[in-house]
């Protein structure tokens, strides 16, 4: 692993620090991107289909058409992000050539490489990756991820998986901080994570990069709950544009993230939103056991 204090790494991490306290919304069109910007989102994630649609479609889910990203970049002044398939470094190269603000190496799309994640150190563009536990988060960081997010259960409008992943990481960090120095080395081996990042996490008492919630956030209350559990910000997918009133829902979630510890404001922004996305309690077979990351995903390529 490259030295985490390398200037390029610090630059990417520093950029992500500026996103703290913000909301990033999934969008499919210029119109949706403008709604997100007007609502106060700090960024938009450009997709061909939002996660709820991807769950119900057969076939391969790939990275977005670059022309759509380019079109949206011209129409909004906030950050523009897009997803690539796990391991698909060429999709990432294409997005970097577009000068996109951030790349999400995402399990929401069809996996491209079962043996490797992308070596994110090779890119100037910062990456965000999903995790379900501390070991997974630190492995992604060792590969060059500048931001971590929960995997959650995208497209369901059901927050249960995201909360599980948040609490898992929090509890593992709490346990790590209780260990003696000699015990830390055994713990690092047990979770298959680089010892330098494990030691840094213990020192900081948190992940060494920005950490957002994602996967199933559908209401202002969901977003505020994630923030109260220690998240730095929130990704919202289908919860905005599958709701009855996307403009109002978007603005309310942004306000909830900014005021997550103020019940009075949370009450106010939760009133008269119209119907939230219908949602689903079904966990997809593809990710039913994703709390135990596939052992193949250990090294970048």
Swiss-Prot record:
Catalytic function, reaction form: aldehydo-D-ribose 5-phosphate + D-glyceraldehyde 3-phosphate + L-glutamine = pyridoxal 5'-phosphate + L-glutamate + phosphate + 3 H2O + H(+)
| Annotated residues for binding of D-ribose 5-phosphate | 26, 155, 216, 237-238
The broad enzyme category this protein falls into is lyase
Q: Which InterPro entries match?
A: Aldolase_TIM, PdxS/SNZ, PdxS/SNZ_N, RibuloseP-bd_barrel
Q: What is its main location?
A: cytoplasm
**Pathway membership of this protein?**
Cofactor biosynthesis; pyridoxal 5'-phosphate biosynthesis
Q: Which PROSITE patterns match?
A: PDXS_SNZ_1, PDXS_SNZ_2
Annotated consequence of substituting residue 151 to A: No activity. The mutant forms hexamers instead of dodecamers
Q: Which residues bind D-glyceraldehyde 3-phosphate?
A: 167
Per UniProt, subcellular location reads as: Cytoplasm
State the UniProt keywords alphabetically.
Answer: Cytoplasm, Lyase, Pyridoxal phosphate, Schiff base
Note the superkingdom of the native organism.
Eukaryota
Q: Name one GO molecular function term.
A: identical protein binding
Q: Which GO terms describe its biological process?
A: amino acid metabolic process; pyridoxal phosphate biosynthetic process; pyridoxine biosynthetic process; response to singlet oxygen; vitamin B6 biosynthetic process
**Which GO CC terms are listed, alphabetically?**
cytosol
Checking PANTHER family in the record gives: PYRIDOXAL 5'-PHOSPHATE SYNTHASE SUBUNIT SNZ1-RELATED
As for family, the record states: Belongs to the PdxS/SNZ family.
Quaternary context: Homohexamer and homododecamer. In the presence of Pdx2, forms a dodecamer of heterodimers.
Role of this protein: Catalyzes the formation of pyridoxal 5'-phosphate from ribose 5-phosphate (RBP), glyceraldehyde 3-phosphate (G3P) and ammonia. The ammonia is provided by Pdx2. Can also use ribulose 5-phosphate and dihydroxyacetone phosphate as substrates, resulting from enzyme-catalyzed isomerization of RBP and G3P, respectively.
User: Any idea what this protein is called?
Assistant: Pyridoxal 5'-phosphate synthase subunit Pdx1
The major lineage groups are:
Eukaryota, Sar, Alveolata, Apicomplexa, Aconoidasida
């Amino acid at each position: 692993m490259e030295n985490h204090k390398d200037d390029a790494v610090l630059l990417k991490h520093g950029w992500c620090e500026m996103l703290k306290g913000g909301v990033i919304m999934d969008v499919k069109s210029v119109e949706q991107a403008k709604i997100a910007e007007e609502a106060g989102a700090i960024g938009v994630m450009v997709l061909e289909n939002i996660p709820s649609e991807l769950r119900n479609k057969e076939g391969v889910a790939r990275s977005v058409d670059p022309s759509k990203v380019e079109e949206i970049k011209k129409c909004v002044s906030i950050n523009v992000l897009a997803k690539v398939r796990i391991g698909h470094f060429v999709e990432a190269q294409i997005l970097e050539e577009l000068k996109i603000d951030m790349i999400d190496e995402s399990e929401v799309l069809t996996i491209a490489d079962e043996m490797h994640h992308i070596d994110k150190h090779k890119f100037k563009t910062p990456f965000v990756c999903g995790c379900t536990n501390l070991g997974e988060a630190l492995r992604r960081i060792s590969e060059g991820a500048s931001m971590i997010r929960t995997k959650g259960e995208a497209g369901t409008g059901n927050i249960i998986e995201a909360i599980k992943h948040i609490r898992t990481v929090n509890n593992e960090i709490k346990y790590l901080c209780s260990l003696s120095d000699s015990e830390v080395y055994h713990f690092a081996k047990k979770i298959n994570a680089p010892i330098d990042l494990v030691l840094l996490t213990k020192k900081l008492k948190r992940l060494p990069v920005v950490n957002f919630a994602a996967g199933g956030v559908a209401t202002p209350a969901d977003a505020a709950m994630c923030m109260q559990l220690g998240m730095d910000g929130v990704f919202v997918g289908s919860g905005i544009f599958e709701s009855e009133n996307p403009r109002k829902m978007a603005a309310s979630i942004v306000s909830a993230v900014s005021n997550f510890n103020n019940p009075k404001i949370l009450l106010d922004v939760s009133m008269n939103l119209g119907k939230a996305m219908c949602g689903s309690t079904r966990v997809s077979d593809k990710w039913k056991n994703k709390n135990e990351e596939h052992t193949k995903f250990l090294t970048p390529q």
